[in-house]
Amino acid sequence: MSDESLRAVDIERTGTRHYAARNARGGVIEIGSGDGDTFTPVELFLAAIGACGAIDVDSITSKRADPTVFQVRVTGDKIRDDAGNRMENLAVDFTVTFPEGEAGDAARAMLDRSVQMSHDRLCTVSRTVEVGTPVASRLTT
């Protein structure tokens, strides 16, 4: 793969079971194991799926009208069994409304299609989950 396709974040331990993830642009997300107000890795996984879809749908529909409500809820079941830990039954639910009028009607007309386009083709995160890809875990020195 090329440098153009490479994406990366760096994660550093900040305390017992607490970490900070940083991107090249300076963004920081605090991550923890479920205590306090940090996100867990599973919550970040769900957030990544939802945010990816939200960005896709919003970028398509807001060209026509800004939404009056735009909410996304992502749910899934965390499974622990002999096959190991994983998520199942992932679902992304969009609640989106637009103002009355011609622009709002145009945005509403694109809503179903934009959600489907995000699911079928645009959202890198959910597409990667659905298609599947190996994850290499390596120890570096």
Feature names for model-found ranges:
Residues M1-A47, V57-T141:
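Extended beta-strand/beta-hairpin segments
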